[in-house]
Structure formats: structure tokens, C-alpha cells
A protein has these predicted regions:
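Macrodomain-like recognition of ADP-ribose-binding/processing modules
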Residues: 1-179
Length: 179
């Protein structure tokens, strides 16, 4: 695990399973517009949470790229799930702004909900095709900027799929000055 302090917020980068983030108040779902089970992160979160999650999500859909909504966590070890629709790279524009909106809005929603810890996947880097290097810079830059405004959130973790993804994020940390 890689850890950096940004003011009062601890930023963590780790390889793991987004559905197994024990002791985190919320996990972020890289959702589809209909907030339904699918592949990747959304499928894993819905499988772990159970059918109650899809039932709660149904009236909240659809959401647009860059938007987030909050639900209960059901069978997950987390009380809350923050669902964000990331941009499809090359289709939803401006992609960097929409991706930054996901991270920023999720942190604001968590903070307003009184949550102290949030675990994110690398939003839009799977089926939505966002290049991991570019997505890492947007994610880490946005989290760094947002950290100063957070009152309740004290720990932000990005849960990555592979050691290579961790390397990409570590390089992005250096690029934004968080060595």
C-alpha cells in the first residue's frame, strides 16, 4: 500500500477487491447509467451487495456522466455505496472534466453524509476505455484539490486491479507533486 497525507486527509493506493474494503464507510461504484448490475466493478458490487441494491437503485436512474448518487450498502461491509457514472473515453466530452466531477462529487456526498472513509475504484479505466495514466492524474489531482474542503472524510483509498495499475498511480503521484 502507498500512503500520502494531504492536509487532514490520508490518501491510500492499494491493489485489492473493491467489495472487501472492511472498515470503510463507503465504496464507490463505477456505475452504468441505469445503476444496474453489469460487468466489472458494477457487477462485483451488485453481486456482493445482493438484490436490495438494484431495487434501491432503480428509481434513482438514469444518471448522466459525472453524476453520483448514494445508496445503502446492503451485503457489503460498507454502510453506503456512492454510484458514479464515469465518462466513456472518446465519446463523453469533456472526459477529464466529467471524470473529475465523479471524484469531486463523490467526496462531497460522502462528506455531507458524515462519512469518514471512502474507497474508489479507478473509474472509467475498464470497459469505458479511459487510459489509466490519464485517469490516474485526473483522479489524484481532483482528490488532492478536494481534500482541503473536506470536514468529515479523513481517509480516501483508490483500490486498484493490478500491480501495474498501482505503478501507474504512483507515477501520477510524483507528477502532481505527492512523492
Amino acid at each position: 500500500m502507498i500512503e500520502r497525507r494531504i492536509g487532514d486527509v490520508v490518501l491510500q493506493l492499494d491493489v485489492g477487491d473493491i467489495t472487501q474494503q472492511i472498515d470503510f464507510d463507503a465504496v464507490v461504484n463505477a456505475a452504468n447509467a441505469q445503476l444496474q448490475p453489469g460487468g466489472g466493478v458494477a457487477g462485483a458490487i451488485h453481486r456482493a451487495a445482493g438484490p436490495g441494491l438494484a431495487k434501491e437503485c432503480a428509481p434513482l436512474a438514469p444518471i448522466s456522466p459525472g453524476e453520483c448518487v448514494v445508496t445503502d450498502g446492503y451485503g457489503l461491509p460498507n454502510p453506503r455505496v456512492i454510484h458514479c457514472l464515469g465518462p466513456v473515453y472518446g465519446s463523453d466530452e469533456p472526459a477529464a472534466v466529467l471524470l473529475a466531477d465523479c471524484y469531486r462529487k463523490a467526496l462531497v456526498l460522502a462528506d455531507e453524509d458524515g462519512l469518514t472513509s471512502v474507497a474508489f475504484p479507478a473509474i472509467s479505466t475498464g470497459a469505458f476505455g479511459y487510459p489509466p495514466e490519464k485517469a490516474a492524474r485526473v483522479a489524484l489531482g481532483t482528490i488532492t484539490e478536494a481534500a482541503a474542503e473536506l470536514g468529515n472524510v479523513k481517509v480516501v483509498r483508490i483500490v486498484l486491479y493490478s500491480a501495474r495499475d498501482l505503478e501507474v498511480h504512483e507515477e501520477a503521484l510524483a507528477e502532481i507533486g505527492l512523492r
